[in-house]
Design a protein with these regions (language model features):
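N-terminal metal-binding scaffold of metallo-dependent hydrolase/deaminase domains
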Residues: 1-46, 57, 385-393, 406-407
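Divalent metal-coordination and catalytic microenvironments
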Residues: 12, 27, 32, 56, ...
Length: 408
């Protein structure tokens, strides 16, 4: 079972998931959940609880990353072809640990982690975020999630194994069956690709994949089983197809135009920008990671357009939820995404909402993302006033992370 504790945090400035609160607060976590949020000096210490004097600190809900790949390291590199298949599971233990230590207490895995990874976290066998899993990525033949390479070899990144079926499917009947297979495997949500991508050798991020009818079938089947659909969508046409079909979120959104932004607003479709992703590919290649040059070149080509599209969507009022695509980049650097969101014009409260309550709402989990009575006692204490100093240099700010009231 996950660890739980009783703790009283005193005299702390508070961002509760929605807004910065006036004054300072005492916040109690009892048996792993928030049990009281009161003005500072109101709550008396109990014998059973640990007291944390948070004078001069800002409390936020635990950060929520809506797009990670916890079983993936250096996505797109050639290293996986020479490594034992099972190494990914052992690496994930470290990936999940550093993600939690970075302040991410809940996350949505966008492909790779199966139900066993989620259960290991729930049982407390490993430490990491509260995790919801897609199991794998659903893709059309020759799509972004089809691991078959031009050489005839198959990439090992999402290789099928018991508990993680192949995600490749075609046609309305085919995608209906595949959606059911992924739900049978334990998927909390369905991840699809409605465009090509940067880290796939044989396609183009501007080209659409899956038809509207196929995506609509996936959404209908997922919805019938209480699941939501997230769509890797970079090119304009594929973004539009996914939004029209009813997906809950667009991942990346590199080539957004005015019409597509208006459609997202109309359908209340969330954007998960992953601004970190193309920058991470470029940095990895420059550091000597063996990533094929066409993938690096695509990353260079899209990086600035990506930034412009996210800024435009934000200005128009599209709801944004934080996601990093960690696994493409280095695990544990999740807070860089908050800095990048600030850099495209989001103010501090908007960035923090995107990184807490918006993520919780997108995942359909009202037990996280807010500092409120009854929610899991997941929070981060940042040194200083975030309201005053902002989040532009957040990785350099000293912090303490708590999950279920337990210090990480």
């Amino acid at each position: 079972m996950a660890l739980k504790a009783d703790v009283l945090v005193t005299n702390v400035a508070l961002f509760d998931g929605e807004t910065f609160k006036d004054g300072t607060y005492d916040v109690r976590v009892e048996n792993g959940r928030f049990s009281a949020v009161e003005p500072a000096g109101t709550l008396a210490k109990r014998e059973s609880e640990t007291v944390v004097d948070a004078t001069g600190h800002t409390m936020t809900p635990g950060i929520i990353d809506c797009h990670i790949h916890s079983l993936v390291n250096n996505a797109g590199s050639l290293e996986g072809f020479t490594e034992p298949f099972s190494l990914q599971f052992y690496r994930s233990v470290e990936n999940l640990r550093v993600t939690l230590e970075a302040g991410v207490t809940s996350a949505r895995d966008a492909g790779g982690a199966d139900a066993g990874v989620r259960e290991a976290l729930e049982r407390g066998l490993v430490r990491g975020p509260r995790l919801k899993v897609a199991v794998t990525i659903m893709s059309q033949t020759a799509g972004h999630g089809d691991g078959m390479l031009p050489s005839g070899a198959c990439t090992p990144m999402l290789m099928a194994h018991p508990g993680r079926p192949s995600g490749v499917a075609d046609g309305v009947a085919g995608v209906q069956v595949k959606t059911r297979e992924l739900i049978r495997a334990g998927a909390d949500h369905i991840k699809i690709c409605s465009t090509g991508g940067v880290l796939s050798a044989a396609d183009d991020p501007r080209h659409s994949q899956f038809t509207v009818d196929e995506i609509s079938t996936i959404v209908a089947e997922a919805t019938a089983q209480g699941r939501r659909v997230m769509s890797h969508a970079q090119g304009t046409a594929g973004i539009k197809n996914a939004v029209l079909a009813g997906v809950a979120s667009i991942e990346h959104g590199i080539y957004l135009d005015d019409e597509t932004i208006d459609l997202m607003l109309e359908r209340d479709c969330v954007l998960v920008p992953t601004l970190q992703a193309p920058l991470a590919v470029i940095r990895a290649a420059e550091a000597g990671v063996p990533i094929p040059e066409p993938m690096v070149e695509k990353s260079r080509r899209v990086a600035e357009r990506h930034r412009e599209s996210v800024a435009k969507a934000h200005q128009a009022g599209v709801r944004i939820a934080m996601g990093t695509d960690a696994g493409v980049g280095i695990h544990g650097q999740n807070l860089e995404e908050l800095e990048l969101m600030a850099d495209v014009g989001m103010n501090t409260a908007e960035v923090l909402r995107a990184s807490t309550v918006n993520g919780a709402d997108l995942m359909g989990d009202d037990s996280v993302g807010r500092v409120r009575v009854g929610n899991h006692g997941d929070f981060v204490l940042f040194e200083g006033s975030l309201e005053e100093h902002g989040v532009g240099q957040l990785r350099s700010v000293e912090k303490r992370v708590f999950q279920g009231g337990v210090a990480v």
